[in-house]
């Protein structure tokens, strides 16, 4: 029973880490990363559609993304959608290919992005702690229902704490890496 709680908690903590990874991928570092354009919505036959579903987005070089729409007539809408997004990107069109250069980050922008990254990391830490709280409550319920002994409860709580510490340390490591990435000129 305790093992089930531990496995469930670990799976949820892994999901929290994956969510943090996705959030960090969307924070631009000045280097080209296709994930930056995942949030861009394009009006596709009257429906807002994610850019990644109507075009191929690839890294052309370290500072440029190349967007190739699957339908040539979508080029103007895609360009407009990228301009309207709050990403601060300025696309240029060459035939059916849209090139999106990544602007160099100013010191002020870097600091703002670091703040955003820290906020995302803190949200993930809170989520992990909430998962710990839930797992601990489940273990204490098992003790109250006399399904486990006090020793098993203590061992279970310790294991959940170790799991929490491991994932919080992982959040800190990923955040430090992202900050280093953002502050590199």
From Swiss-Prot:
GO molecular function terms attached to this record: ribosomal large subunit binding
Pfam families noted in UniProt: RRF
GO BP annotation list: cytoplasmic translational termination
InterPro entries (alphabetical): Ribosome_recyc_fac, Ribosome_recyc_fac_dom, RRF_sf
SUPFAM superfamilies per record: Ribosome recycling factor, RRF
UniProt entry keywords in alphabetical sequence: Cytoplasm, Protein biosynthesis
GO cellular component, one term: cytosol
Subcellular location(s) per record: Cytoplasm
Role description: Responsible for the release of ribosomes from messenger RNA at the termination of protein biosynthesis. May increase the efficiency of translation by recycling ribosomes from one round of translation to another.
Entry similarity comment: Belongs to the RRF family.
NCBIfam families registered for this protein in UniProt: frr
The protein, known as: Ribosome-recycling factor
Organism of derivation: Hahella chejuensis (strain KCTC 2396)
Gene name for this UniProt entry: frr
């Amino acid at each position: 029973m305790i093992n089930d709680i531990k496995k469930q908690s670990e799976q949820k903590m892994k999901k929290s880490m994956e969510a943090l990874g996705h959030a960090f991928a969307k924070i631009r570092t000045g280097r080209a990363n296709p994930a930056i354009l995942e949030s861009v919505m394009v009006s596709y036959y009257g429906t807002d559609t994610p850019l990644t579903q109507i075009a191929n987005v690839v890294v052309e070089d370290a500072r440029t993304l190349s967007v190739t729409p699957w339908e040539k007539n979508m080029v103007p809408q895609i360009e407009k959608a990228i301009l309207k997004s709050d990403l601060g990107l300025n696309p240029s069109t060459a035939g059916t290919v849209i090139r999106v250069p990544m602007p160099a980050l100013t010191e002020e922008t870097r600091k703002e992005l670091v703040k955003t990254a820290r906020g995302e990391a803190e949200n993930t830490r809170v989520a992990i702690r909430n998962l710990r709280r839930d797992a601990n409550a489940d273990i204490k319920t098992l003790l109250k229902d006399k399904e486990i002994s006090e020793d098993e409860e203590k061992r279970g709580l310790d294991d959940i704490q170790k799991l929490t510490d491991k994932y919080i340390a992982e959040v800190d490591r990923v955040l430090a890496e992202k900050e280093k990435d953002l502050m590199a000129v």
